[in-house]
Amino acid sequence: MTRTAVLLLTLLFLVAMAASDKIKTREVCWNEEECENWE
């Protein structure tokens, strides 16, 4: 594996983690104003 491939995989992983976190927060709060309190 090249370093570029490893970097891309790491970035994809981080983006996926961030996306799943946002989805979890969306389940908890219903509007943007309440979401800010969950960060």
Swiss-Prot record:
Signal peptide region: 1-20
A GO term for molecular function: toxin activity
GO cellular component entries: extracellular region
Domain of life (superkingdom): Eukaryota
Keyword annotations of the record: Disulfide bond, Neurotoxin, Secreted, Signal, Toxin
Tissue-by-tissue expression: Expressed by the venom duct.
Disulfide bond sites: 29-35
Places the protein is found: Secreted
Main localization category: secreted
Domain comment (free text): The cysteine framework is C-C.
Function of the protein: Probable neurotoxin.
The name this protein goes by in its record: Contryphan-Cal4
Organism the protein comes from: Californiconus californicus (California cone)
